[in-house]
């Protein structure tokens, strides 16, 4: 399997080396968790994985789950000679090419061969056309082919591929500081958590139990979405922190109607700040997006931020709901996120879309941040086992 990097390939030597070490460790833990064989050789520009023929597609799909990876391809490793490349392309054409247009996409890593990338495209295309099955009329389309035969020629080996699995990109997991992820079990928060994981930050998942204001399936759906997130980083000791927030939420509801959601979100990030201090996290991540709810207007987000000294990261800030929902479907967290939870009872009769920090401070319970500290200290730790997405199979 040939594994390609993105941002990782442009890092300085020292930083790149540390990140590649993280990527290799993450990849090996994924292979072990999924019971897949593979020898992982992490190189400066590419990672090569040697595996069994029957496991090659599953290993390539696993490689495409590794943060920092742009794409992965089941590949045939051969000698970097014209004859070997022609033979490999001919074999691939005879076995798989069943009609439509094709192209040979060739590239070389160094100028140490007696041919250019253009030469490979030319003689490789001839080999594909000559070996095509009898019922096929080969046709070249370099712009939008039905079939792409990829050839990557490196100094010591050449690699021929027909299939490419797109990866998440980003940075290797664990190369950034951890963040506290506030997970409600809704559509947005697991997607936001995944996005910071994709950029290298481990997460500390925190769920606030709303007591009488939560529904019977509220916690269950939050746990299931976190299990799906854990699938992408199974080498970690995953915990789900359940914060008993029912009494505090009830007191906030009694104290305010208009502005209630703002006061609650300020309490929420204060809880997250306390937990971040305990876990060495450098910030908080939420699934908020500008204007999606009354508490998420630009002005109201600034009022929420004023309740904590930590940065509040919002990866979905400018995303539309349809885009977020599609991302949740790709992660296989959408169905769990849409289980009825019955927590809309907390919503006020009149929404506050343009709040005032002074007014919220005046109306919110004066002990709300003390409650946040106590509730965070009482958080229950629940071990999490990773769960595979519905479309996964070895």
Model-derived features: positions:
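Nucleotide-activated chemistry modules centered on ATP-dependent adenylation/adenylyltransferase
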Residues: 2, 26, 131-140, 144-181, ...
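Short beta->alpha connector loops
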Residues: 54, 186-187
């Amino acid at each position: 399997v040939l594994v390609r990097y993105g941002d990782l390939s442009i890092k300085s030597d020292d930083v790149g080396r540390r990140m590649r070490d993280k990527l290799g460790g993450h990849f090996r833990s994924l292979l072990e968790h999924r019971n897949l064989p593979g020898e992982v050789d992490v190189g400066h520009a590419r990672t090569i994985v040697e595996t069994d023929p029957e496991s090659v597609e599953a290993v390539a799909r696993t490689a495409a789950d590794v943060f920092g990876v742009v794409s992965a391809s089941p590949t045939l490793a051969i000698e970097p000679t014209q004859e070997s490349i022609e033979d490999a392309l001919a074999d691939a054409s005879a076995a798989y090419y069943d009609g439509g247009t094709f192209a040979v996409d060739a590239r070389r890593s160094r100028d140490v061969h007696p041919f250019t990338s253009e030469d490979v495209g030319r003689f490789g295309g001839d080999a594909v056309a000559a070996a095509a099955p009898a019922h096929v009329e080969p046709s070249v389309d370099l712009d939008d082919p039905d079939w792409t035969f990829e050839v990557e020629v490196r100094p010591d080996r050449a690699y021929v591929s027909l299939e490419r699995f797109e990866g998440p990109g980003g940075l290797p997991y664990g190369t950034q500081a951890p963040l506290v992820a506030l997970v409600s079990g809704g559509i947005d928060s697991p997607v936001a958590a995944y996005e910071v994981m994709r950029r290298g930050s481990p997460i500390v998942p925190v769920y606030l139990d709303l007591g009488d204001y939560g529904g019977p399936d509220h916690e269950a759906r939050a746990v299931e979405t976190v299990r799906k997130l854990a699938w992408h980083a199974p080498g970690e000791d995953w915990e789900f922190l359940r914060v008993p927030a029912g009494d505090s939420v009830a007191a906030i509801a009694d104290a305010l109607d208009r502005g209630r959601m703002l006061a609650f979100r300020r309490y929420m990030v204060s809880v997250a700040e306390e937990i971040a201090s305990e876990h060495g996290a450098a910030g908080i991540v939420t699934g908020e997006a500008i204007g999606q709810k009354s508490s998420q207007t630009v002005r109201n987000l600034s009022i929420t931020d004023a309740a904590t000294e930590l940065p509040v990261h919002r990866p979905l800030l400018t995303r539309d709901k349809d885009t977020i929902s599609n991302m949740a479907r790709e992660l296989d967290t959408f169905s769990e996120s849409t289980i009825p939870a019955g927590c809309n009872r907390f919503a006020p009769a009149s929404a506050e879309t343009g709040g005032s920090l002074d007014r919220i401070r005046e109306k919110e319970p004066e002990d709300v941040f003390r409650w946040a500290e106590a509730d965070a200290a009482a958080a229950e730790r629940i071990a999490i086992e990773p769960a595979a997405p519905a479309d996964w199979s070895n």
